[in-house]
């Protein structure tokens, strides 16, 4: 193996999302919207059971919720997990059925962007925005629309522009100056409804 190849392998790093940390950040951000009184009934949707990205995101969400429960012993905090599917129609059916059976659900956490379909279910049923808190991962048009409508309160942005841009910059610095690359966690960008107008403008420029 050549010296340059050895150097390249020694500086190999990752630019992307730490799934567990991102899930934790999502739940922590959403906790700011939890009702101040009464029981809290949380539902965590694992869209792809057995797949690392979904399981670890869910693990991060549940880690925070368990910590929250331990810190609020004066409140009833219930945490459930469900296979919520990776299809908007299926997610809507499964979570819609769950909400029918459990109308006192406080919040639903998705490990992808499929909570957008749950928002539509709530709207179609005449449920007011914020009655069931919603949050998930990735910025897609459906999610941004539901954030503007008030149904989705928190979303994790993987910041794909940064995922593409930063590795190129690090490769350039390694090649020109011999600088060692670093791991970059791009996946804990928290987006709330107030951010949507700016994001939509930047999306038109290919930056978000």
Residue ranges and their predicted role:
Residues 5-8, 36, 48-52, 84-87, ...:
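Solvent-exposed loop/turn segments at secondary-structure junctions
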Residues 22-29, 52-75, 94, 117-118, ...:
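Short, solvent-exposed amphipathic alpha-helices that sit
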Residues 28-36, 62, 66-70, 96-104, ...:
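Sec-exported extracytoplasmic/periplasmic mature domains
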Residues 49, 53, 64-68, 159-208:
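Hinge/cleft segment of the Venus flytrap/periplasmic-binding protein
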Residues 61, 80-146:
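Hydrophobic alpha-helical
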């Amino acid at each position: 193996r050549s010296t340059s190849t050895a150097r390249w392998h020694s500086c190999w790093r990752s630019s992307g999302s730490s799934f567990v940390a991102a899930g934790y950040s999502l739940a922590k951000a959403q906790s700011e919207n939890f009702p101040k009184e009464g029981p809290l009934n949380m539902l965590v949707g694992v869209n792809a059971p057995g797949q690392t990205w979904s399981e670890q995101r869910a693990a991060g969400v549940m880690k925070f919720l368990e910590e929250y429960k331990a810190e609020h012993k004066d409140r009833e905090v219930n945490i459930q997990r469900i296979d919520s599917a990776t299809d908007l129609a299926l997610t809507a059916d499964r979570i819609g059925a769950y909400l029918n059976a459990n109308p006192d659900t406080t919040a639903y956490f998705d490990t992808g962007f499929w909570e957008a379909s749950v928002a539509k279910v709530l709207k179609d049923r005449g449920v007011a925005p914020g009655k069931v808190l919603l949050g998930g991962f990735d910025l897609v048009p459906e999610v941004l629309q539901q954030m503007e409508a008030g149904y989705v309160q928190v979303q994790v942005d993987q910041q794909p522009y940064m995922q593409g841009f930063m590795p190129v910059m690090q490769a350039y610095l390694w090649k020109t100056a011999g600088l060692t690359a670093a791991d970059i966690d791009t996946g804990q960008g928290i987006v709330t409804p107030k951010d949507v107008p700016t994001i939509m403008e930047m999306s038109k420029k290919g930056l978000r």
